[in-house]
Amino acid sequence: MPIVGLFNKEGQKITDFELSDKVFGVEVNQYVMHQVVVALLANKRQGTQSAKTRAEVSGGGIKPWRQKGTGRARQGSIRSPQWIHGGVVFAVKPRSYRISVPKSARRLAMKSALSSKVEENQIVVLESLEMDTPKTKEVVKILDAFEAKKTLIVTAESNQNVYKSARNIQGVSVIPVNNLNVYDLLKFDKLIITKDAVSKIEEVYA
């Protein structure tokens, strides 16, 4: 069972903290994580790009000049692809880029991403991250205490004070545990997570 330190906001270790083997101690599966990240990014695409073919652009019904005798190249329509304002060859049309990934694969990818943070010693568990008012200095102090640069902060619930305190800090993102995903876990080097958020993750994935 993985054991990490439980810290306060000043960076002082309070005690050891046990993590679930079933969530934070699985064998890291790079392939499944890659598949899930590809799907996440693909599913963000709108797929609304559209261009017109020569059949759809306006104008061009009449032959611009006679076939022979002008000295110019023969043309049949001013909306042929080689003309300015002509149609597009193989014009792109709206489509869905959605990729489906089995639930079991998504769960394994999440466990693998969390386990990789434990393996790399890039996870920090905080006893609490409560703030009465937004204070960027307070978040900066926490980051400095753990020498954290590119950091993902995960809270148990949506916390506007923490979010507002960190949103102007470059390379730092704050999300509630409900919105935690594999892409964000891999994108950021360090994971700072509250004890309550860990409990929620273990409830879902253990």
Curated annotation (Swiss-Prot):
UniProt superkingdom: Bacteria
Pfam families, per the entry: Ribosomal_L4
Lineage of the organism: Bacteria, Bacillati, Bacillota, Clostridia, Eubacteriales
Alphabetic keyword roster: Ribonucleoprotein, Ribosomal protein, RNA-binding, rRNA-binding
Subunit structure and binding partners: Part of the 50S ribosomal subunit.
Stated family: Belongs to the universal ribosomal protein uL4 family.
Function per UniProt: One of the primary rRNA binding proteins, this protein initially binds near the 5'-end of the 23S rRNA. It is important during the early stages of 50S assembly. It makes multiple contacts with different domains of the 23S rRNA in the assembled 50S subunit and ribosome.
GO cellular component, one term: ribonucleoprotein complex
Name listed for the protein in its UniProt record: Large ribosomal subunit protein uL4
Gene Ontology molecular function terms on file: rRNA binding; structural constituent of ribosome
Organism: Clostridium kluyveri (strain ATCC 8527 / DSM 555 / NBRC 12016 / NCIMB 10680 / K1)
Keyword RNA-binding assigned: yes
Stretches for region Disordered: 51-76
GO terms classed as biological process: translation
